């Protein structure tokens, strides 16, 4: 005889215990649908973590995945209007909202008088999607004797809360921060600097621009490394400075060769965390390379860099340390991109300058 074990009760949406001859009504089908919806969300959530949920890549013909605006009513109340949103919540639920020709989803809020004095006031725009609360939709079929709207849509709700009041990483499985508002003088506007949680570098226009921009900088750094190394190898005299610069160039070129194919073909689909890992690792490798040199050689190298692009030795090492030790925050992506961008621009500027130094000048020092 088979011993059938009992599971612990308490599932949010249990299966229906079907039996022959049982009375059936719509509640049973709703329970069944809720069970599989919940299971699908939970299965999807197993593939998610704190760094790969959020806005999805926008569809062809659309400029953004989360489109909302803000207007001020004559009463002084501020109203946020959501036009569309395509995203994946941390709980694995797909948000696919498009107002189309219907009324847009709205949320109203009012700024208290004492808050208007805070010049740095910001508010998070949060979208809630509840697939278990259905809203009737569609045009009734005239052939049905009992008129009803044939379709059902998930319930969506929009809210606006002061930034920092709620931790975006712990909102719950059906909530998502989709944008931010900020004060600009005496009025509020959409904060264009804020990048909400995104599943990939193709989920936000600014992230796509970072992907393209960083790719161009990588190409430039690789070419400059090759040119510098050629000068070092062809120099009549191999000084310690020349050897160390050549060593840095080799490490840079080997690193780029390791990531180039993947970055070129998959980089635009990387989650922001994986994307930043590429450049944080490059900075860390350069920082480690400095540690290969003795104290005098490192000081000589950093002084040489300072002569050609004005970065003082302490600032250069600090730049490498800052990018090596990035702490990723899915709710605050922009500052991390700016940090990586600053490193790449300064390193590219230095390397490009060194690659353009004339041979005579190169032989004098290198």
Tell what function each PLM region has.
Residues 3, 143-282:
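Mixed-charge (acidic/basic) macromolecular-recognition segments
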Residues 6-83:
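N-terminal "first-domain core" detector
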Residues 9-12, 97-115:
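Short linear interaction motifs
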Residues 83-88, 178-181:
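Short polybasic amphipathic segments
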Residues 266-366:
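Extended, amphipathic alpha-helical scaffolds
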């Amino acid at each position: 005889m088979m011993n059938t074990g009992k599971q612990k009760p308490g599932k949010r949406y249990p299966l229906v215990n079907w039996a022959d001859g049982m009375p059936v009504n719509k509640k049973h089908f709703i329970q069944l649908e809720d069970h599989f919806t919940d299971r699908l969300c939970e299965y999807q959530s197993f593939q998610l973590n704190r760094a790969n949920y959020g806005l999805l890549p926008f569809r062809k013909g659309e400029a953004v995945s989360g489109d909302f605006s803000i207007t001020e009513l004559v009463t002084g109340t501020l109203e946020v209007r959501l036009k569309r949103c395509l995203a994946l919540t941390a709980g694995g639920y797909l948000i696919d909202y498009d107002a189309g020709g219907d009324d847009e989803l709205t949320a109203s809020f009012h700024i208290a008088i004492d808050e208007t004095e805070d010049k740095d006031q910001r508010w998070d725009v949060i979208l809630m999607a509840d697939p278990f609360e259905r809203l009737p939709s569609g045009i009734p079929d005239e052939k049905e004797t009992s008129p009803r709207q044939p379709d059902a849509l998930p319930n969506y709700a929009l809210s606006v809360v002061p930034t920092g009041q709620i931790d975006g990483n712990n909102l719950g499985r059906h909530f998502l921060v989709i944008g931010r508002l900020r004060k600009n003088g005496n009025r509020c506007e959409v904060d264009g600097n804020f990048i909400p949680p995104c599943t990939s570098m193709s989920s936000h226009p600014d992230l796509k621009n970072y992907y393209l921009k960083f790719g161009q900088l990588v190409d430039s750094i690789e070419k400059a490394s090759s040119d510098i190394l050629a000068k070092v190898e062809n120099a009549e005299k191999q000084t310690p400075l020349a050897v160390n610069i050549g060593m840095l160039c080799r490490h840079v070129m080997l690193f780029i060769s390791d990531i180039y194919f993947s970055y070129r073909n998959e980089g635009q689909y990387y989650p922001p965390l994986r994307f930043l890992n590429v450049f944080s690792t490059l900075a860390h490798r350069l920082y480690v390379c400095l540690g290969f040199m003795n104290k005098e050689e490192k000081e000589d190298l950093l002084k040489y860099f300072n002569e050609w692009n004005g970065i003082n030795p302490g600032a250069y090492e600090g730049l490498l340390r800052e990018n090596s030790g990035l702490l990723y925050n899915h709710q605050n992506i922009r500052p991390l991109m700016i940090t990586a961008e600053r490193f790449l621009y300064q390193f590219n500027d230095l390397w490009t300058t060194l690659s353009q130094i004339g041979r005579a000048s190169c032989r004098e020092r290198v």
